[in-house]
Amino acid sequence: MKEIIIWSAYLDAEKSRKEGRKIPKELCVNNPKIKDIYNSLRKLGYNAEIVKNKCHPKEWWEIVGYIKVKVNDDIPKLEILKKICENLKK
């Protein structure tokens, strides 16, 4: 098992790659909330934990928090991000 960090910026269609978006815009959602991402991960069966009062390194002035997720070593992070967005769009 490994632990990965997911910031809302990774899934935000309004952000550029330079600002932290990790997947293509077509797959992203507009302004995803940490709570929605957390709920999506729980629906997908992942063990997740919200960490509040943290700033994304590219937006150090904005306190948003992130999510820690425990996943199997063989699952790529981008695969999980795509699944989250699919779930959020439903």
Curated annotation (Swiss-Prot):
Q: Which GO terms describe its cellular component?
A: signal recognition particle
Q: Which UniProt keywords apply?
A: Cytoplasm, Ribonucleoprotein, RNA-binding, Signal recognition particle
Q: Which InterPro entries match?
A: Signal_recog_particle_SRP19, SRP19-like_sf, SRP19_arc-type
Is Disulfide bond included in the keywords of this UniProt record?
Answer: no
Give any single GO term for biological process.
SRP-dependent cotranslational protein targeting to membrane, signal sequence recognition
Query: Where's it mainly located?
Result: cytoplasm
Q: Which Pfam families match?
A: SRP19
An MF annotation (GO) of this entry: 7S RNA binding
Q: Which Gene3D superfamilies match?
A: Signal recognition particle, SRP19-like subunit (3.30.56.30)
**Function statement:** Involved in targeting and insertion of nascent membrane proteins into the cytoplasmic membrane. Binds directly to 7S RNA and mediates binding of the 54 kDa subunit of the SRP.
Q: Say which family it is in.
A: Belongs to the SRP19 family.
| Protein's UniProt name | Signal recognition particle 19 kDa protein
Q: Which species is this UniProt entry from?
A: Methanococcus aeolicus (strain ATCC BAA-1280 / DSM 17508 / OCM 812 / Nankai-3)
